[in-house]
From Swiss-Prot:
<dbReference type="InterPro" id="IPR050357">
    <property type="entry name" value="Arrestin_domain-protein"/>
</dbReference>
<comment type="similarity">
    <text>Belongs to the arrestin family.</text>
</comment>
<feature type="compositionally biased region" description="Polar residues">
    <location>
        <begin position="405"/>
        <end position="420"/>
    </location>
</feature>
<feature type="region of interest" description="Disordered">
    <location>
        <begin position="405"/>
        <end position="446"/>
    </location>
</feature>
<dbReference type="GO" id="GO:0005509">
    <property type="term" value="F:calcium ion binding"/>
</dbReference>
<feature type="modified residue" description="Phosphoserine">
    <location>
        <position position="474"/>
    </location>
</feature>
<feature type="compositionally biased region" description="Polar residues">
    <location>
        <begin position="430"/>
        <end position="446"/>
    </location>
</feature>
<dbReference type="GO" id="GO:0030674">
    <property type="term" value="F:protein-macromolecule adaptor activity"/>
</dbReference>
<dbReference type="GO" id="GO:0031625">
    <property type="term" value="F:ubiquitin protein ligase binding"/>
</dbReference>
<keyword id="KW-0472">Membrane</keyword>
<feature type="transmembrane region" description="Helical">
    <location>
        <begin position="194"/>
        <end position="211"/>
    </location>
</feature>
<feature type="modified residue" description="Phosphothreonine">
    <location>
        <position position="502"/>
    </location>
</feature>
<dbReference type="InterPro" id="IPR011022">
    <property type="entry name" value="Arrestin_C-like"/>
</dbReference>
<feature type="compositionally biased region" description="Low complexity">
    <location>
        <begin position="531"/>
        <end position="555"/>
    </location>
</feature>
<dbReference type="GO" id="GO:0070086">
    <property type="term" value="P:ubiquitin-dependent endocytosis"/>
</dbReference>
<dbReference type="GO" id="GO:0005829">
    <property type="term" value="C:cytosol"/>
</dbReference>
<dbReference type="GO" id="GO:0005737">
    <property type="term" value="C:cytoplasm"/>
</dbReference>
Length: 596
């Protein structure tokens, strides 16, 4: 008795700790697409006194066992046994290697960590059937010296699979619909294909009788489990297989005796929360488990005889981590079914949804709305952003607020560097001159207050662009002479023709200065003198009109495109048109008229 008590008091604590809740390892994805899953933990040992050990090790072993018996008239006893057992995974850790010499562990606490990456195609745990199973066990061993017994600690762990996030085929609604000619048209659907063991399956029925006075009787719902076992070396070394079908759950509704041209109802089929009653879907080497929903609808015909409508839907059952928790966690599977089995919205119901406006506008990848001329699909229900003034103002306010938030403390908005966030705002240019050199230097700075996002986002229509004659000048044009300035300088550098008065010069690329009253009087007197001279010398009126037309062209050497107020009807050779052009240009008094 003293020896036994001494053995028990050597270690006050000896356990295998797994870094997973409920000792449950969840593998994300199916066997053909899952990534490696980590398994880690530690072996903890608390010694009350010093002991002498040879080695300390840990071993992870996964075993698969398939066994069943079947009657056989040729075998004594009438039973033929098929059995196969093999190791599906094995991993060893040596914490204290065996070297032949003993090692003394003093009293205290010891912890030996372990870690392994389990392959994605590893077989998951299968438990609950007597004929087959796949189990994983951790076994820690401490080999002691002399007559002391070996210290062994075992821990059972489970490996389960969870559906990947991109498994769309398991989250979509599945249904079966058909028409029984001259009898009934039916649709039976479930919201998703995959369900958690311990939850429930909502089943929706839509029945439309095609025969007058046809009524719906009882509706039967049954969940079937199909198990297929196979061994490569069974009785006498021969391969053998076995198919087994069992009923997991069943439900039957009451008869619908009332007459109607449309029946629609939903029934919930609760799933068991025990692996003994229901297993998960799996496809392993030698073990295959599938599930199906079977439906049977009784139809009462007008003549009194009963017809039966049958249909089936395949479903996938998965093991949830909550199944191994306490009772409250298991009950949450049914209470929170909508969060576990919420199907994704269909494309038809979501294609016209408006984007969420509460996001940050700092990383916009799309340009601002281009205006009412943006192409748009016919009969489209999508929002028209060009006509939505509130949305445009909200966008401008958000961009301006973001620019102010990104400014460092102590800096004005004009001191923003364009290299910080070049995509936030279009740059605003400030042109200055270098007083020391006299050369103009362009200092590009960002100024959100001077930038009109509303103007930048507007694109004129084709009609407005073709009618507008005012050129859109860039702020950089002031550093280099424009084409109009060069043409005007060349025109002024030429010697003036005799009898031609130089018109007032243009002071800016976008407008002209009207002539003064003295200039108009000098022009009137000069034209009167020329007319009297031409009359006395025999000059024809065509020469006079040509000189007036030349005077009109000299006042605008760049053509009518640079001066929008110039009439486009002025042409050389027409005396009336030349006078009208000069009068409209305010270069002739209103009382001046053509003299014959």
């Amino acid at each position: 008795m003293n020896i036994l008590s001494r053995k028990e008091n050597v270690a006050s604590y000896f356990d295998i700790r797994v870094a997973a809740e409920h000792d449950l390892i969840v593998i994300q994805g199916l066997a053909d697409s899952a990534e490696p899953t980590p398994l880690s933990g530690s072996v903890v040992l608390c010694l009350n006194e010093a002991i002498s050990v040879k080695a300390i090790s840990l071993k992870l072993v996964g075993k698969c066992r398939i066994s069943w018996s079947e009657p056989s008239p040729t075998v004594r006893g009438g039973q033929r046994h098929n059995k196969q057992e093999y190791v599906v995974y094995e991993k060893n850790w040596i914490f204290v290697p065996y070297t032949g010499a003993n090692r003394t562990l003093r009293a205290g606490n010891y912890e030996y960590p372990f870690h392994v990456m389990l392959p994605g195609d590893i077989a998951e745990s299968v438990e609950g059937l007597q004929s087959c199973y796949v189990v994983y066990r951790l076994k820690a061993s401490i080999d002691r010296t002399g007559l002391a017994s070996k210290m062994v600690k075992k821990k059972h762990i489970r490996l389960i699979r969870a559906l990947p996030a991109d498994a769309i085929e398991y989250t979509q609604t599945i249904s079966v619909d058909n028409t029984w000619p001259n009898k009934i048209e039916y649709t039976i659907s479930v919201p998703t294909k995959a369900y958690a063991i311990g939850s429930y399956i909502p089943i929706h029925f839509v029945l439309v009788p095609l025969l007058k006075r046809l009524t719906i009787g009882k509706i039967s719902i049954t969940l079937k489990e199909y198990i297929t076992l196979h061994v490569a070396h069974g009785y006498n070394g021969l391969p053998a297989s076995k198919d087994e079908v069992r009923t997991v759950r069943s439900l039957q509704t009451e008869e619908l005796e009332e007459f109607s041209d449309h029946y629609e109802l939903t029934k919930n089929l609760e799933l068991p929360s025990s692996l003994v009653e229901c297993l998960q879907d799996c496809d392993l080497d030698g073990i295959k488990i599938r599930h199906k929903l079977k439906f049977s609808v009784s139809l009462r015909n007008p003549d009194g005889h009963i017809s039966e409508l049958r249909a089936a839907l395949p479903v996938v059952l998965m093991i949830p981590p909550q199944l191994f928790g306490d009772r409250a966690e298991v009950e949450s599977l049914r209470e929170n079914f909508e969060s576990f089995n919420q199907p994704l919205p269909s494309y038809q119901n979501s294609m016209y949804d408006r984007l969420y406006d509460g996001l940050s506008y700092s990383n916009l990848d799309t340009p601002l709305p281009s205006g009412a001329t943006t192409p748009r699909r016919r009969d489209s229900m999508e929002p028209t952003y060009a006509s939505n003034e509130a949305h445009r103002r909200q966008l401008i306010a958000g961009l301006t607020e973001l620019a102010l938030q990104q400014q460092p403390q102590g800096r004005s908005p004009n001191e923003h560097s364009p290299s910080n966030h070049p995509e936030d705002f279009p740059p605003s240019f400030s042109l200055g001159s270098n007083p020391s050199s006299g050369a103009a230097s362009a200092v590009i700075t960002r100024n959100p207050s001077e930038t009109s996002l509303a103007d930048l986002s507007r694109v004129p229509s084709y009609k407005e662009a073709t009618r507008s004659a005012v050129p859109l000048e860039s702020p950089l044009q002031s550093t280099l002479p424009s084409y109009e300035d060069v043409a005007r300088i060349e025109h002024l550098s030429r010697p003036p023709s005799p009898g031609i008065v130089t018109p007032p010069q243009r002071t800016s690329p976008s407008f002209f200065v009207s002539p003064t009253e003295s200039t108009r009087q000098s022009l009137d007197s000069r034209r009167s003198f020329e007319h009297s001279t031409s009359s006395s010398s025999g000059i024809s009126p065509s020469h006079s009109s040509a000189s007036l037309a030349h005077l009109s062209q000299a006042s605008n050497p760049n053509g009518s495109s640079s001066a929008p107020h110039r009439p486009t009807s002025a042409r050389v050779g027409s005396h009336r048109n030349a006078l009208d052009a000069l009068r409209r240009a305010r270069m002739l008094p209103s009382g001046f008229s053509r003299r014959n």
